[in-house]
Design a protein with these regions (language model features):
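A short linear hydrophobic-aromatic micro-motif
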Residues: 20, 57-59
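Amphipathic alpha-helical dimerization/coiled-coil segments
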Residues: 1-4, 26, 74-99
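Juxtamembrane helix-loop transition sites at the ends of transmembrane segments
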Residues: 34-35, 43, 49, 92-95
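Alpha-helical residues within the helix-turn-helix
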Residues: 37, 48, 54-55
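N-terminal helix-turn-helix DNA-binding core of bacterial DNA-binding proteins
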Residues: 3-44, 64-76
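Short, hydrophobic-biased segments on the C-terminal half of alpha helices
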Residues: 21, 50-51
Length: 99
């Protein structure tokens, strides 16, 4: 189980993937082109990262006509990101008070 957790954290340790997940969470469902634009990432790079996230079960997709819409598949992932960000905000605030 710890190896699987380490693999999940490895996937989440890449800033581009976190940006994509953040944009997916904000948009609910979104086509890859729009996601790439919102995240400021190239289309091929976005597709590569989405494929990795989808294989890990973190991102899902569905087809609507000729469009494929992507979404966050595991609701725990945005919560995990928020926990880490809140921890960092507290840490930075404490460091600022010490300065």
């Amino acid at each position: 189980m710890l190896d699987a957790a380490a693999e999940r954290f490895r996937l989440l340790a890449e800033p581009t993937r976190l940006r994509l997940l953040n944009e997916l969470e904000a948009a609910d469902e979104i086509p890859v082109g729009e996601l790439a634009e919102r995240a400021g990432v190239g289309l091929s790079n976005t597709s590569k990262h989405l494929h990795q996230l989808e294989r890990a079960g973190l991102v899902g997709r569905r087809r609507v006509g000729t469009t494929i819409l992507y979404r966050v598949a595991d609701p725990v992932i945005p919560q995990l990101c928020e926990i880490v960000c809140a921890s960092l905000r507290r840490r930075y605030a404490a460091l600022a008070e010490q300065a």
